[in-house]
Amino acid sequence: MASKRGSNQDESIFRIPPYYYIHVLDHNDNVTKVVVGPKTYIRQDHERVIFGPEKMITIPPRHYCIIENPVVRNDTDQVVYDNLGQVKLFHADQEIRLAREPFPLYPGEVLKQAVTALKVVQANAALRLRAILDFEDGTQKRVAGDEWLFEGPGTYIPRKEVVVDETIRATIIRPNQAIKLRARKETNDREGTARVTGEEWQVKKVGAYLPGAYEEVVDTVNAYVLTEKNALHLRATRTFVDMKGKTRKNGEEWLINMADTDAHIPDVYEEVVGVVDINTLTNRQYCVIVDPVGPDGKPQLGQKKLVKGEVSFFLQPGETLEQGIQSVFILGEDEGLILRAQESFKDANAAGAVRQPGDRWMIRGPCEYVPTVELEVVTRRKAIPLDENEGVYIRDTKTGKVRAVTGETYMLSQDEELWAKELSPAVEELLQSAKDPVAERSDRRGDRAAPRAREKTRVISFRVPHNAAVQIYDYKEKKARVVFGPELVMLGPDEQFTQLSLSGGKPKRPNVIKALCLLLGPDFCTDIITIETADHARLQLQLSYNWHFDVPDKTDVAASAKLFSVPDFIGDACKAIASRIRGAVAGVQFDDFHKNSAKIIRASVFGFDEKNKVRERFLFPQNSLVITSIDIQSVEPVDQRTRDALQKSVQLAIEITTNSQEATARHEAERLEQEARGRLERQKIMDEAEAEKSRKELLELQANSAAVESTGQAKAEAQSRAEAARIEGEAAVDQARLKAEAAKIESESELQRLTNAREAETKYVREQNALEVNKTKQMSDIETERFRNMVQSIGADTIKAMAMAGPEMQVKLLSSLGLKSTLITDGSTPINLFNTAQGLLGGFSAKRGIEHVEEED
């Protein structure tokens, strides 16, 4: 052994402290001895210290250690040596040493387990011990492999023959709890009951339970608390006797409810299938239980049981509800139930009538009905209210006949059902589109809503617009009828619409227009045809035809049927008209056709009457279609060269016409100019004659005036001067009068202006003063209200304290300084020292009073 301290083995003197020791090897006899301190050991030459100095092992109270290969001691607890002086050892043995005086390890001894505290086992705990050697424990003999418990409270003293497998703690069993135990081998439980290996049992006693040595806790089982609204569904895992003393067979199922116990802890041989809720039925509910449990507790397989409310019950194991809890059928006057018998029984609701399996019948309201277990409810019927323009298709399930019921409220019987009438996809699309056949014949609008699905059991109705007709064919009667609008058409079960597939587009293409109703017109259609003249000029014409159907008597069945004799009357009419036009144009030169196109086309289409005049209409006798007029919208050559030549000829004709009109206008202008010149010369001659006549009269007047001048010149001068004076005086008077009137008008206007200005200014000042007074009044009211609110919010005592705070503070300050009066000023200010303190305090108080008065204002 090597020294743990790494001592220098060449040293000769070893100082061993108290409770220390060393191992010294004697090389002469190869014996190792122990030297215990306190001591100073002088090593001899033939000795070598192989271990130490090392501290002795000290075991405090309630501690222990394990020594391997312990020394042999005699009866007096002394170490035994052999004849060579070497200590004897129990090799491959162990010794457990408890609290004692410190001791050294002798050569060969090994400290297998250091000093360790003894295990203190608490209450409700135990140590599972297992014997690894045979030994006797007092009066009890233990065999290797035996197990037992050291139960607390206590301190466990270990033995070398025993090992501690585990610490077991007691399981706390609370109210409504139990623990499931299993025997690991044959043993007796705490109550002394013998248990075989693998057997399980329960302990329900409330408190702490400490499992035995051969017992193991499998699980803690909680009790199921039962109420009035739930029950516990149990199944036996083996045959046993339950807590009531009843034998339960393996696989048997049963219920435990509150009537049996408030809380149930499942036994070890009971398996909880689930918690079953109570089923509660009101007085308007019922249910059918399948495979009900009989009075003997056994299920009656294949039977049913009707339960009506008010009642509450639990479903027993094996029982099921057919379609769950159902409501009682409350039937009104317009409702009924279709019933079907499942088995033969007497119907108490029908005066004891015997119902055979498969029978169907109907009960009508008003009533309250609960179906029995012998029958089933097929369906619930409700009367279908129908207006005069509404209907439904009904089929008799016994005879297969289909009929239409309209204009009444109808309820299907037990042998009737709604029949769905199928239509072709094209007719379905036309019916669902809900377009107006007159106003919405085009599909160019892309914002149309999605079509609504048709209810196929409803009678198909179609509104025929004014001046239109619809043909309906009855495949059963093999007859057709034509209905003229405005009318509402309702199809019978075997009737179908005659669908129209008309040509459309420009030029006409077949099967473009789909329609159910035939418009009688008048209307127009436009077509583009290609013709060829006698000189092989190919032209393209765009023509528009006005058409209508000539139906003088709509009650005439034969005449009405002729309307639908031609499936595509547009295409046939356009083809017939185009054929006539081509035939007529084929024998005409291009120039003639170009000059007389309208006449040629009208004559070719309408033909001539007995007087060789063009007829006014073209009649198709097959379907009474009448063409009344033709509009030539455009004529264009098909060949490009012909088109260019025609354009040149048209330009040349325009130039010729223009030149002719220009020459005519020039000749007319020259003629008018000559006529105007002649009238002017004549007028000059007449003016000269008139001038000569006027000159003659002038000479006569000059002669008369000369005579008058010679005889009364003086008189005339006097009269003229008098008249001039008179006129001058009247003018001066009028001028003075006008000036006076002008001055008066000016003064009146100025007075009116000043009056208006003063009145306006006075009104403005008055309104401004009123506004100022109103503003001042409102401001004073606001200030008064504000001050009142401030006074109310602060309080009179607070205001008084604030007013007195300044003077009181000054008085207190002066009193604290011991001064009667104080004045602080500079050298340039004169001071009146009379009544100084009173003046200062009075001035301060007066200032506070002034401020207070201002605040009140």
From Swiss-Prot:
Tissue specificity: Expressed in embryos, tube feet and coelomocytes (at protein level). Not expressed in sperm cells (at protein level).
Domain IQ: 665-694
InterPro entries, alphabetized: Band_7/SPFH_dom_sf, MVP, MVP_rep_dom, MVP_rep_sf, MVP_shoulder, Vault_2, Vault_2_sf, Vault_3
Name of protein: Major vault protein
UniProt xrefs under PROSITE patterns: IQ (PS50096), MVP (PS51224)
Role this protein plays: Required for normal vault structure. Vaults are multi-subunit structures that may act as scaffolds for proteins involved in signal transduction. Vaults may also play a role in nucleo-cytoplasmic transport.
Region: Disordered, residue numbers: 434-453
Biased composition regions of type Basic and acidic residues, renumbered to the chain: 437-453
MVP repeats: 18-60, 62-122, 123-174, 175-227, 228-282, 284-332, 333-387, 388-441
Subcellular location: Cytoplasm; Nucleus
GO CC field: cytoplasm; nucleus; ribonucleoprotein complex
Quaternary structure and partners: The vault ribonucleoprotein particle is a huge (400 A x 670 A) cage structure of 12.9 MDa. It consists of a dimer of half-vaults, with each half-vault comprising 39 identical major vault protein (MVP) chains, PARP4 and one or more vault RNAs (vRNAs).
Highest taxon of the lineage: Eukaryota
A Pfam family annotated for this UniProt entry: Vault_4
Keywords of this entry: Cytoplasm, Nucleus, Repeat, Ribonucleoprotein
Transmembrane region(s): none
